[in-house]
Amino acid sequence: MTEQKRKIEKLTGVKGMNDILPQDAGLWEFFEATVKSLLRAYGYQNIRTPIVEHTQLFTRGIGEVTDIVEKEMYSFTDALNGENLTMRPENTAAVVRASIEHNMLYDGPKRLWYIGPMFRHERPQRGRYRQFHQVGVEALGFAGPDADAEIIMMCQRLWDDLGLTGIKLEINSLGLAEERAAHRVELIKYLEQFADVLDEDAKRRLYTNPLRVLDTKNPALQDIAQNAPKLIDFLGDESRAHFEGLQRLLLANNIPFKINPRLVRGLDYYNLTVFEWVTDKLGAQGTVAAGGRYDPLIEQLGGKPTAACGWAMGIERILELLKEEDLAPEQEGVDVYVVHQGETAREQAFIAAERLRDTGLDVIFHCSADGAPASFKSQMKRADASGAAFAVIFGEEEVANGTVGVKALRGAGAEGEKNVQQTVPVESLTEFLINAMVASAEDGDD
């Protein structure tokens, strides 16, 4: 019997954990460059924490009765030492842990920012993934409403820098612990009247985390949630003054907002100010950035009592908006694609490509796909497909004469009759290319 060749199974990525392909990477780089420039303008410093943390960090920090801890964390036991570990579902707790562990606050407040992947085990859908990326800020050691207003202003400035419109700000105050406790008693009394019509999620939260019932997305419970006792009515003088101070600063800076009494956020560490930036352009996943104040968290994780506030935004959702509004920038090609014909020409072309890179130009050198020399036509086709501005052509005749061919592929120089191959002395190649690119850019601006 003839032995058939076994078919090798094709492996695929994990559902909800997506590859970022080269055609999309340019948009990511554009966003990252824009947000990093903004963060520098506000004096924030980058911090990078591990993807894996002790599970206890999140159960203590986020709260044991939150959806994230109960249902969404990727947790495992380390086979080497039995430690319970978790792939970070968010990064505020990790930044706070790092600031305590490394005594970062001993010499005063800190403005920190992070960017990277987070992980939650949930059903993948548009705008919601199992691996997703966030950029966030943490302002540690600032107690006043001015810090709250500043981090909110940063978001508005980012929307402006990106050209995004239609992202609206909603704010609320969760008050202090004793105010939330008084509200909790009345809220449970109110919700108990509807125990027979509450869905399973609401029943589960009724006595463990009743505040989250107000955030229900179930259409059948909207009237119940809308008419529930409002936490804002339980605020004391200190909490009310903080919230009013925030509103004054936002109004003074022409930032429109809506007070949403049902805005409670899904993490237990928040107090006083909470906020969300929302859009109606992404369907059900309309929150693109969210945050607030978390004054108790640093002490809760073993540090000294320290005020703090921050936000996180979902990068995938913002990129979706950029595409939706046709704001994605065109992906730029390299400056030069080096083409060659003949062995001697190939060696000279290889050397020239390195010298061009020495001057700061971006250069692709044509490498053989199969080990055999490629035709001039196929190389020029590759050069055009690469998006390069110019093709630099080395042939045996040009090398013998100490010259090189240059042909414009993009920009004003590639248009009309003037798009002919020019012969340039090798020693003048760099100067010629730089002058040609400057001239092409100026023609394009006219």
Curated annotation (Swiss-Prot):
Q: Which gene encodes it?
A: hisS
Example of a GO biological process term? histidyl-tRNA aminoacylation
Record the organism: Burkholderia orbicola (strain MC0-3)
What's the protein called, per UniProt? Histidine--tRNA ligase
The record lists the catalysed reaction(s) as:
tRNA(His) + L-histidine + ATP = L-histidyl-tRNA(His) + AMP + diphosphate + H(+)
InterPro entries this protein is in? Answer: aa-tRNA-synth_II, aa-tRNA-synth_II/BPL/LPL, Anticodon-bd, Anticodon-bd_dom_sf, His-tRNA-ligase, HisRS-like_core, HisRS/HisZ, HisRS_anticodon
Q: Main localization of the protein?
A: cytoplasm
Family stated for the protein in its record = Belongs to the class-II aminoacyl-tRNA synthetase family.
What does the UniProt keyword field contain? Aminoacyl-tRNA synthetase, ATP-binding, Cytoplasm, Ligase, Nucleotide-binding, Protein biosynthesis
Alphabetical GO CC annotations of the entry are: cytoplasm
One Pfam family per UniProt: HGTP_anticodon
Under SUPFAM superfamilies, the record lists: Class II aaRS ABD-related, Class II aaRS and biotin synthetases
Q: Which GO terms describe its molecular function?
A: ATP binding; histidine-tRNA ligase activity
Lineage in the entry?
Bacteria, Pseudomonadati, Pseudomonadota, Betaproteobacteria, Burkholderiales
